[in-house]
Amino acid sequence: MQDSSLNNYANHKNFILMLIILFLMEFARGMYILSYINFLPTVTSIAVAITSLAFSIHFIADASTNFVIGFLLKKFGTKIVLTTGFILAFTSLFLVIWFPASPFVIIFSAMMLGIAVSPIWVIMLSSVEEDKRGKQMGYVYFSWLLGLLVGMVFMNLLIKVHPTRFAFMMSLVVLIAWILYYFVDVKLTNYNTRPVKAQLRQIVDVTKRHLLLFPGILLQGAAIAALVPILPTYATKVINVSTIEYTVAIIIGGIGCAVSMLFLSKLIDNRSRNFMYGVILSGFILYMILIFTLSMIVNIHIVWIIALAIGLMYGILLPAWNTFMARFIKSDEQEETWGVFNSIQGFGSMIGPLFGGLITQFTNDLNNTFYFSALIFLVLAVFYGSYFIANREKAK
């Protein structure tokens, strides 16, 4: 009994420390990717094309690394992989201090940061306890969201004081996360040193076994990300509100998401499979309705209400979807499978803005992008609703 209590305490301590490390790394990512490089064209000689390229390369590096990181963790161990990641992130962001307007450094740092964050995410997802998955995944996604948003806002404020003087803060945050890592005992589901060919075969095998999940993983991210390029224009040109009022809508949605992740996500634990199915299906249908409704709304107060509803639903849909995916994963392939899933999700987030921007540009109508996003959620609702009904019938 005492050994069990000590083991539970150690697992809880490790989980909390990893949450803090994830928060700090996402904080650094928010500072650099969402704030610093976006402001560079306005305060230095860096061209917008360079910062746009850096932004894209960051997420390409992230998605590509996710695809193989689980296998690298199993082959080389967590200490080598994570330490390498921290070195890459710290060194690249440290270079920004000395070369704040170098195109090569800006792009290189974005790529290295994308690689460095990947193993932390995979370890977090694979270390979640099954009987507490909903609750703990709520904490994981909350740490991610809070880190990104607070990092972005914090860097925005520092840039207003001076555009480049506080660049050292980004590498400092990574250094703190790196130090905290040495107080964590990270364990994998198993270790193996299989040859590269065998690992490639396993990637193909993992992919084939989880094809059912890929539409949901890919299209959810694409549907949400498709709206990103048009939302500022929608706010200022269609609703005719200021940037501040638009920012308030984002904050309200973020607060709703945070509340849901912290308090509602635990509802997923110890509930029936049908309850989880209901949450996922309701989430897809509600998203379809709310996004379609946005195309007809010109009142900012109603937009705020919709933003709150979207945030609340997102905060419980993510843990529910994560729990659904977890049921398909073999216990000894957690790291590899979550890595592949994250890679597919990252690819969806990359193609979403591309489609959203192109639809608006070629049709010259913002509403068509809202229709596109809503249609994706309708397709997901029909596809997985059919699966849930069929699976429920089989279980009887």
From Swiss-Prot:
The keyword Isomerase does not apply. One of its GO terms (molecular function) is antiporter activity. GO terms for cellular component: plasma membrane. GO terms for biological process: lipid transport; lipoteichoic acid biosynthetic process. The chain crosses the membrane at residues 15-34, 46-73, 80-99, 105-126, 138-159, 165-184, 211-231, 243-264, 276-298, 304-326, 338-358, 370-390. The keyword Electron transport does not apply. Keywords: Antiport, Cell membrane, Lipid transport, Membrane, Transmembrane, Transmembrane helix, Transport, Virulence. It is a multi-pass membrane protein. It comes from the Bacteria. InterPro entries: ATG22/LtaA_families, MFS, MFS_dom, MFS_trans_sf. It is found in: Cell membrane. Proton-coupled antiporter flippase that catalyzes the translocation, from the inner to the outer leaflet of the cell membrane, of the lipid-linked disaccharide (anchor-LLD) that anchors lipoteichoic acids (LTA) to the cell membrane. This is Proton-coupled antiporter flippase LtaA. It comes from Staphylococcus aureus (strain N315).
